[in-house]
Swiss-Prot record:
Zn(2+) binds at residues 33, 81, 90, 93, 96, 101. Residues 1-84 are annotated as: DNA-binding. This is Ferric uptake regulation protein. The keyword Cell division does not apply. It is found in: Cytoplasm. GO terms for cellular component: cytosol. Residues 85-142 are annotated as: Dimerization. It comes from Vibrio parahaemolyticus serotype O3:K6 (strain RIMD 2210633).
Length: 149
């Protein structure tokens, strides 16, 4: 039995072709922080005939089962990533939407200190930092942050 079949069964989900195909796409390195619409387009590019409504339904099931994590970055649409990754935080460009994952031990320790100060036991947290790509590195607007000539 494949790992994906077992992952679905472990999550209490029936193994179906749409679930397997969507899980396969989510496992591709370039498909982290992917919207339902972009995942649907990727499936179409791969020749898969899975409807957009099915993609949304499966992503919601995966989210409920803990297979994916849903993020609501600025801009209003949800994006998804596999939940099997290590804890990390996110930097998000407000112009192009690029998402950079990072981990920082100092930030993690400071959060624990703040929680202890207020007598709170942390169970989970999410940290999103928003900004704009600098030095012309923005995919959406490469000239937005260059000095005027």
């Amino acid at each position: 039995m494949s790992d994906n079949n077992q992952a679905l069964k472990d999550a209490g989900l029936k193994v179906t072709l749409p679930r397997l195909k969507i899980l396969e796409v989510l496992q591709q390195p370039d498909c982290q922080h992917i919207s339902a619409e972009d995942l649907y387009k990727k499936l179409i590019d791969l020749g898969e005939e899975i409807g957009l409504a099915t993609v949304y339904r499966v992503l919601n099931q995966f989210d409920d089962a803990g297979i994916v994590t849903r993020h609501h970055f600025e801009g209003g649409k949800s994006v998804f990533e596999l939940s099997t990754q290590h804890h990390h935080d996110h930097l998000v460009c407000l112009d192009c939407g690029e998402v950079i994952e990072f981990s920082d031990d100092i930030i993690e320790e400071r959060q624990r200190e703040i929680a202890a100060k207020y007598n709170v036991t942390l169970t989970n947290h999410s940290l999103y930092l928003y900004g704009k790509c600098s030095d012309g590195g923005c995919k959406e607007n490469p000239d937005a942050h260059k000095p005027a000539k």
